Amino acid sequence: MLRRLLGLTRPQPNSQLRLAWLKKRGWLAAHLTGSVPQAPRKPHIESVAAATDSLGPQALAAEYGEVGGTRTPAVVRSSSRCGDLYAWLVQQRSPATIVEFGAAFGVSGMYFSAGLEASGAGHLYSFEINPEWAEIAERNIGSISTRFTLTRGAFEDRVADVVKGPIDIALVDAIHQYDFVMRQFTILERRMSPGGIVLLDDIDFDRPGARMREVWQDLAGRPDVAGAVEVQGRLGIIELSASRRT
């Protein structure tokens, strides 16, 4: 306790990230290295995530098409390293508006919110189609910040009613299927600010018919994408051109 009060605690080691660049240009290329600091309030976030995982398997939403299907919170959560990256992006970019879909159990939302609290500005809009998962996510994110709105419903159905301004950072992490993600991206890109950052989780999802690797490659190859990098073999990040118009 005395060491904490005197500011003598050891600095926490940075998270090391494995990067694979597809387009090494733009803001991402200038600022993103293979190392980011640990997120603010990380011990609390990971403690909440562990408590959530102890709830055991939770039923999937009907939209996933798996009758009787379940997932454990640990399987669908963002990794702690990616969480550090999310908080770092927020602190570096100072976004006014972050959007994520789906929220799952709120781990990514907690990391985004930790970055917003550290920055002292901005708002997270989170969407989750599973009402039971949404309740847990809302409670978890609320343990970090009040700078968020959690909407029960699909992004593509509700975004026009909920998010009024341009989106600066977006996390796409809902149903992992090529056509579904592409339809969501078509809606999302019209609302992104110039130079905005889009994160695509689970690009390594290889269930038959998912084609998530193909989604990532097609989006990264677009001419209006300034930078594109793969993180930990799982997360794709694209930086939209600063000259594009919303």
Short names for language-model regions:
Residues 1-171, 175-246:
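A short alpha-helical cap/connector motif
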